[in-house]
Amino acid sequence: MPQKFEQMQSAEQKHDEDETIAQAGTQIDDTVDALDAVLDDIESVLESNAEEYVGSFVQKGGE
């Protein structure tokens, strides 16, 4: 009898672990999508006017 309880408990723990892993996977996918969006924005700015963008970070004559 105690063995059955341990097996049931183990199955429940595995199910909980599977749910946690699935949730973590979803969060990772969301984070990757957000990062991709930021990188796409940066790429579009650089494609449209890279010289002006880079020039805004360059110091001029002792500034």
Curated annotation (Swiss-Prot):
Region (ARC ATPase binding): 19-57
A Pfam short name: Pup
Covalent cross-link Isoglutamyl lysine isopeptide (Glu-Lys) (interchain with K-? in acceptor proteins) as placed by the record, residue numbers: E63
One GO MF term attached to the UniProt entry: protein tag activity
Keywords: Isopeptide bond, Ubl conjugation pathway
GO BP term, pick one: modification-dependent protein catabolic process
UniProt entry tagged with the keyword GTP-binding: no
Matches recorded under InterPro entries: Ubiquitin-like_Pup
Compositional bias (Polar residues): 1-11
Domain of life assignment: Bacteria
Region (Disordered): 1-28
Pathway: Protein degradation; proteasomal Pup-dependent pathway
HAMAP family (alphabetical): Pup
Free-text function comment from the UniProt entry: Protein modifier that is covalently attached to lysine residues of substrate proteins, thereby targeting them for proteasomal degradation. The tagging system is termed pupylation.
Record note on domains: The N-terminal unstructured half of Pup provides a signal required to initiate unfolding and degradation by the proteasome but is not needed for pupylation, while the C-terminal helical half of Pup interacts with ARC to target proteins to the proteasome.
Family: Belongs to the prokaryotic ubiquitin-like protein family.
Subunit text: Strongly interacts with the proteasome-associated ATPase ARC through a hydrophobic interface; the interacting region of Pup lies in its C-terminal half. There is one Pup binding site per ARC hexamer ring.
Protein's name according to its UniProt entry: Prokaryotic ubiquitin-like protein Pup
Native species: Bifidobacterium adolescentis (strain ATCC 15703 / DSM 20083 / NCTC 11814 / E194a)
Taxonomy of the source species: Bacteria, Bacillati, Actinomycetota, Actinomycetes, Bifidobacteriales
Gene field: pup
